[in-house]
Structure formats: C-alpha cells, structure tokens
Amino acid sequence: MVRNIDDLEFCLPSHSDAILSGLQTLRFNPRLSDVILVVQGREFPCHRAVLALCSQYFHAMFTGDFQESISAQVEIKEVDPEVMETLIDFSYTGRLTINQGNVEGLIRTSNLLSFPAVRKVCSRYLQQQMDATNCLGIWEFGETHGCPEVAAKALSFLQENFEAVSQEEEFLLLSPERMLCYLGDPLLQVRDEQSRAKAALHWVKQDKECRAQCLPQLLSVAQLSSLTDQYLQELMEVEPLISESEVCRTLIGKNLGQETRGLREQSPVFLQEVLVVVGGKVLEEEEEDEDEEDEETQRTSANFAYYNTKTKKWMAFPDFPDYNKWGFSITSLSNDVYVTGGSRGSRDDSWSTRQGWRFVLNEGIWKPITPMINPRTNHSSASLNGEIYVIGGTLQEAVEVECYDPYSGTWSLISPAQKYVSNFTAVGCSGKLYLIGSCAMKYNALTLQCYNPATDGWSVIASPFIPKYLSSPCCCTVGGSVYLIADNTKKVYMYLPEVNLWKKVQLLHTLHENGGMTSVGSCLYVTGGHWHGMARDYSVVMESYDCNTDVWTRQGPLPSPWLYHCTSTIFMDTSRWTEEFQGQPEAEL
C-alpha cells in the first residue's frame, strides 16, 4: 500500500469545453442522441439535457408530465429551421454569429423558446446598431416582440435625434397614427422650433393624395404657437398644401399674432437645449487661519446651474449633494445628468469613489445610481446608444472601461482600450466611442482609438495630421465631427471620422484649465479658469464657437470661481426653473 503521499486536487480546464464539443459531434449518431426536433420537415438530433440547460421552454417540456418528455421526436411549430439550427448549435458551443439578417428571427425565437442568453445578446446588438435610419423599425420590433428595453432605447433615440430621423426613409413610411404619435411627443428634442412643422409637410409630400387630409391634425400637434409670425406667414403664402386647405389656413391664422400679443408663454411646453455645469472645488484664499464657519460656507456653496443661451443668464438647479469634489465626470442621457467618480481628498492624498449620481430632470432631484465596478478619478464619461460609458481613471495599467445600462441599472466591464493612455478624453460620435490621448510623459504624441459597441472591439486609428502632445485634452461632437482642445494651447482641432482627417479651426481667445467643452446646437461652449495679471487674478470664463461661421465669442465669467467643474447639455422646459444662480464672486490670490 502506498504511504505518506499528499492529496492531489486535479482539474482539467478544458474538460467542460471538450465534453460540449464532443456532444455536438456525437449528437448526429442516432445511438447517442435522445430526441429529434422536427422543424418544418427538417430533423435536428439533440440531447434533452443540453437543451433543458439552455432553454426554460425545453426544461419545462422535458421535465414535466408531457408527451414530449418521452417522445423520440418533438415537432416545434412557428419556428424557422435556420434559426432553430443556430440556437441548437449555440446550446452546444456557446457561440453565435448575429447579423442584420438573423437578429430579428433570433430574438423572436429566443423569446418563444426561452433562450435568455440569446435574447439578451440580440437585444444588446439591436440597441448598439441603432441610428437615424433604423430606430423607428427597431422601436416597432421591440414593441411587437416583447423587448421593452429595446423599444425604450429606440424611443429615446428618436426623441434625441428627431430632426435627423425625420429625413430618413423609415420616417416617410410611418402610418398616420404613428406619425401623429411621434410628432405630438412633448419630449422631442428639436434645435429648430420649425422642425415639427417641416417634418409634417415632408411626410405629407411623400404621398400628397392620400396624406393631405392628415395635415390639419398633424399641424395641430406641431406646436405652431411656438413659431414666429414671419414663418407662419411664409407657410400661408408659399406652401400650397396649406394655402389650398381652408382648415390649415384657419389653424395657421389662429396662431398668427400671438407673438405680438405676448401669448407665447401659453404655448405648449417647448424643450430648449441648455448648458449645464456641475461645480466642484471653489477657489478660496490660502490662509492658514481659515475658521470653521468659512469652511462650512465653502463646503455647501451652490454648485449646479444651467446657462440659457437665449437670455444669457445662469439659472439655479438643486445642488449636487456631494460638495467640494474634483476629478469627477459628467454626461447626460435622456435629459438626465449623470455624475460619476471623483475624489474629495487632496491631489497628493486622494481617494477615488465608485459613486454615481443621476439628476432626474422631471422630478428635480438627485438620486444615487448603482456604484461603478471600479473607483475612478480624472476619468472620462460619454453617452452612446442609450448607455453611459466611463473610461479610465483607475489605478490599473490599462484603460478600463465600464458601461451603464439605465434600463436595468447595472454596470458591466467591456474590453479595455488597446493602448494605454493616462492623459485623455472620450466622446461618442456616430455610433462609436472615440478615445483621444497619450501617456503622461511630456511630448508623447496623441493616439486615436475607436470602440465599436456592436462587436465589443477597439481599434487604433492611424490618422493623418493628428495633433501632437496636448495637456488635459477635452472633446465634444457637433454634426458628426469631433472638436478637440487642451489647456496648454489655444489651438482647436476638428476630426472628421468619415474621412479620417484632422484640421485646425479658429483659435480660442484664452486658455481654459480644469473646465469643459460641450455643444449647444451648432455652437461649442468652452469653460475653464485661467490666471492673469501681476496680481494673479483667477477667472473662470466661457466662450462659444459658431461652427458655421468659424468665430469665437466671449460669453463672460461663470457664476462661481470653480477650480474644478464639468459641463454637458440637456433639453428642458426653462419656464420650470426660473431662479437665478447665486454663486460666489471671483476671487484673487
């Protein structure tokens, strides 16, 4: 007998894969399979146990008191044999190829036969493929086939991109009922108040004979009362569909003159795009004998505001509850503002947080969201395809990325960027996530990386004329182009993804540190502080850039001397928030 030998725990890592692979091969041997699925005349030999593990439908069928539990053959009705074959192969291999041609069939069948893993990945695939050309069809599909998360994100995409969607073929194919529903949605985000009326006319002109009778009803929900008298008069004079319809003329006539009579305030709610800022640390005098009262005042100074680009005023929002932070990041999604990460320690002794907050615009309150998987400071965040991505800012030697699904309230890790960068910015543009940055080493050239959410894959883009080293870069998008600035130069760069080309635009008026850049309509808004003069005065200022005229315009100071802040944009009813923001005056050291 063998003595004095230690136990050995043996595990063959490839065993489970080998078993499944072997079962996939052996199932075609009639002696080694135990059931045959028959779909429209095609036969698929299988193992009951494998199907039951992957499908709740088959689990109930084979373990319940049904005839199918003992039958050698089971007929599956209302299922495409090609899709059935794909699902069976997935059950044995765990692999699945999803494309435009099979995704609808896979979702439909995985719902019917309860393959939750397949349904989930197909749902995400549809959400990541969404754009202006297909969001309406995806919305219809999600509604019809019991995918509420898909329908919700498609509707959100439509609301945020109505003007682009209204130019696509799917929009012109809408039924009158759907058209009326979409056009009357009070949450549509339109940058041009004429967009609803233009969309209604565009749709009717696709089939004048059949659709002209729908125009009065469509115009009745097109918020005509928010339009100028000049535009309404032009419609009456130059648009035959209106001038030749007594009902339309009457409808237009009722709204003429409201502008001069001051009745615009009684018009339906019109969502206006505004700039929002969340402030962190505020400039304070460096005095060692600062008393506790001053510290408490500093800690609770107002820190959340929006800028109305029409009135040129800063208005107050309810304070962000986590005062005096730095290193956090903000983005907006469905007109709610999300703040992630950051630190409240000093820059020499900082501690990052996993915290996330959401300002729910409709309720006017801040709510915590599910904490991130990793703590992050000095990271970037971006919204893309109805989800939020947070990039970098961890202590790892890799650019770790997480994705937040607001529908399920969950975070998930995605593939890290291919190349490590520590000095970076990120933005979503045309269905992709762009990461622009370099290592912290001085004069290290920038790298452009692109993430495709549909494939969960990153690529490094070799781009001609990419800018050299930039300190603390910051970017945003306007009209499908990416604009890039930094705090060490007044130069402004524009990247055109369609042609993979960089070019320079007009210089900034001043440098901006620890600020942000966002877009409102066709204009960029850049914020941030700078030191000036012999007295070392510190100013936090804003300037705007008109992308159509290539001109920068100074917009004055921010309402508080924040040493750190972030900006974004949302659409909102400005009549709801009318209190001017009371910040701190600019200070000097």
Curated annotation (Swiss-Prot):
This is Kelch-like protein 30. Pfam families: BACK (PF07707), BTB (PF00651), Kelch_1 (PF01344). It comes from the Eukaryota. Residues 33-100 form the BTB domain. Kelch repeats lie at residues 274-335, 336-386, 387-431, 433-480, 482-522, 523-572. Keywords: Kelch repeat, Repeat. InterPro entries: BACK (IPR011705), BTB-kelch_protein (IPR017096), BTB/POZ_dom (IPR000210), Kelch-typ_b-propeller (IPR015915), Kelch_1 (IPR006652), KLHL30_BACK (IPR030582), SKP1/BTB/POZ_sf (IPR011333). The keyword Transcription does not apply. Residues 135-237 form the BACK domain. One of its GO terms (biological process) is proteasome-mediated ubiquitin-dependent protein catabolic process. GO terms for cellular component: Cul3-RING ubiquitin ligase complex; cytoplasm. GO terms for molecular function: ubiquitin-like ligase-substrate adaptor activity.
